[in-house]
């Protein structure tokens, strides 16, 4: 195991072993222990008591973080010519269709989100092997396949994120940056956790949220009390 640096030891010493924190406490603590020399992302890892191999226990959804992600989200709008102006005015970084489909075929994926229209989805099918593994395939369930292109682009730019439980039953999602006020990190985290509770599958038995950890890039993680995460 790699030896901890002095900074890492200092950070670790601020977190009490075996203690669980409220969201507000964890958010303040993460700001204290985040020692990266860049504006680190703050992430939540939520372990759910579900079996994602079963279709009736899959958890996926979208949430608009009230304080945004802190990230400049690059959006590609794959639209027909009549929708191009709408996409540009809403703030899409790249707008077009066939030229971008060709670029993606060639391996280009330098975007965070792709938004498209139902009539274009047929053209995206063959690109699934490029887009799927990167989480870029548009999906009606996450609002990225729609006729209201302007709203979809605006929502993503304002802090709308989508999430999905992984094969281990964990949802990973960013809830801001270390430069955010602790209150903003906490507000975003609560919004995500509340959304996860609403999405509890009927087939999920027993305790739904098993553990919640908050961390920032290169920082130790802080455990959040699963019974107190709605506290202000």
Swiss-Prot record:
The keyword Transmembrane does not apply. Disulfide bonds: none annotated. SUPFAM superfamilies: Ribosomal protein L1. Keywords: Repressor, Ribonucleoprotein, Ribosomal protein, RNA-binding, rRNA-binding, Translation regulation, tRNA-binding. Part of the 50S ribosomal subunit. HAMAP family: Ribosomal_uL1_B. This is Large ribosomal subunit protein uL1. It comes from Christiangramia forsetii (strain DSM 17595 / CGMCC 1.15422 / KT0803) (Gramella forsetii). The lineage of its organism: Bacteria, Pseudomonadati, Bacteroidota, Flavobacteriia, Flavobacteriales.
């Amino acid at each position: 195991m790699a030896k901890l640096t002095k900074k890492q030891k200092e950070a670790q010493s601020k977190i009490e072993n075996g203690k669980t924190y409220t969201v507000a406490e964890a958010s303040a603590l993460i700001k204290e222990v985040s020692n990266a020399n860049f504006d680190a992302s703050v992430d939540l890892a939520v372990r759910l008591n579900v079996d994602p191999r079963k279709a009736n226990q899959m958890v996926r959804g979208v949430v608009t973080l009230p304080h945004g992600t802190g990230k400049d989200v690059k959006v590609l709008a794959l639209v027909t010519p009549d929708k191009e102006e709408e996409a540009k005015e809403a703030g899409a970084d790249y707008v077009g269709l066939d030229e971008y489909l060709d670029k993606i075929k060639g391996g280009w994926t330098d975007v965070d989100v792709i938004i498209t229209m139902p009539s274009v989805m047929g053209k995206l099918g063959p690109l699934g092997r490029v887009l799927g593994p990167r989480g870029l395939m548009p999906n009606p369930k996450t609002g990225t396949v729609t006729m209201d292109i302007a709203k979809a682009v605006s929502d993503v730019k304002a802090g709308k994120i989508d999430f999905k439980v992984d094969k281990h039953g964990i949802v990973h999602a960013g809830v801001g940056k270390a430069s955010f006020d602790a209150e903003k990190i906490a507000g975003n985290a609560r919004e995500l956790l509340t959304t996860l509770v609403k999405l509890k599958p009927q087939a999920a038995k027993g305790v739904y949220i098993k553990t919640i950890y908050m961390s920032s890039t290169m920082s130790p993680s802080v455990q959040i009390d699963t019974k107190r995460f709605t506290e202000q």
